[in-house]
A protein has these predicted regions:
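Glycine-enriched, solvent-exposed interface loops adjoining structured elements
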Residues: 1-251
Length: 251
């Protein structure tokens, strides 16, 4: 898939062949991988049920320790955020209630002598993704109420992909979102030129990227209960913000 990304990005940039190439293939590969990471975070399109085992009396767990499968097989590098959590019981699972960090800090964390129990609440604290090829040493983590024994947790994770190094690298980003990647990569290349005309072109390309991301989300959600997915946005948002139709048009 990398070769296809590079070719499509070159066409968008009308990149001439060597020796007058404006953007090297190495640079385009870098921009493509940046685009893929940003897309994965924005669209939350790489979903994995990750797993992690608790440690007795340990509340904090790093995203980096969540098992999301074999990266070389599924193309997943790591976790960006967690939206739901369960713990396994017998052959089934029980839901763990998510809480905002201020609530968790006051009602669960705020205890000099915490008592062990089965998982009842959890909260994300750390932000962002690491490690992998991010260059960051920090990353997200989450807390649960003090576990009294080892529990196997199942986590609903939004993930980011491994970097593409050649055409055999597995792509974790699903279609239709893959159509957006070359547009972001081309925009990034034009931004790097630091030229007014190219910067203007970059904004147009970025707007096209945004359109493809939105279309992919709409296409991926079923017609029934379309708005039940958090990534879809709120159809009543305009009314809540008291935004009026242009030109006095009716609602």
């Amino acid at each position: 898939v990398l070769d296809s990304y590079v070719a499509r990005t070159q066409r968008l940039l009308q990149n001439p062949a060597a020796p007058t190439s404006l953007y090297s293939e190495a640079d385009l590969t870098l921009y493509i991988n940046i685009a893929r990471g940003q897309l994965a975070g924005e669209a939350e399109c790489i979903k994995v049920l990750g797993t992690i085992d608790t440690v007795v009396d340990q509340q904090a767990y790093d995203f980096a320790d969540i098992d999301t499968g074999v990266a070389a097989t599924n193309g997943v590098q790591g976790v960006i955020n967690v939206s739901q959590a369960w713990y396994t019981v017998g052959t089934g699972r029980k839901w763990i209630a998510p809480k905002p960090w201020p609530w968790f800090s006051l009602y669960t964390f705020n205890n000099p002598v915490p008592q062990g129990n089965y998982p009842t609440t959890w909260s994300q604290y750390g932000q962002g993704a690491a490690p992998g090829d991010t260059g960051s040493v920090n990353g997200g983590n989450f807390y649960i109420n003090t576990p009294d024994q080892v529990y196997s947790l199942v986590l609903d994770c939004s993930c980011y992909p491994i970097a593409l190094v050649d055409d055999t690298t597995v792509e974790a980003i699903p279609y239709l979102w893959t159509d957006a990647v070359p547009w972001y990569a081309a925009a990034y290349a034009l931004w790097s030129a630091q030229n007014n005309a190219r910067m203007a072109d970059a904004e147009r390309y970025f707007n096209t990227y945004t359109m493809f991301v939105e279309r992919a989300r709409k296409a991926s959600n079923p017609s029934i209960n379309r708005w039940m997915y958090s990534q879809s946005g709120d159809p009543a948002q305009a009314a809540k913000m008291q935004v009026q139709p242009r030109g006095g048009a009716g609602g």
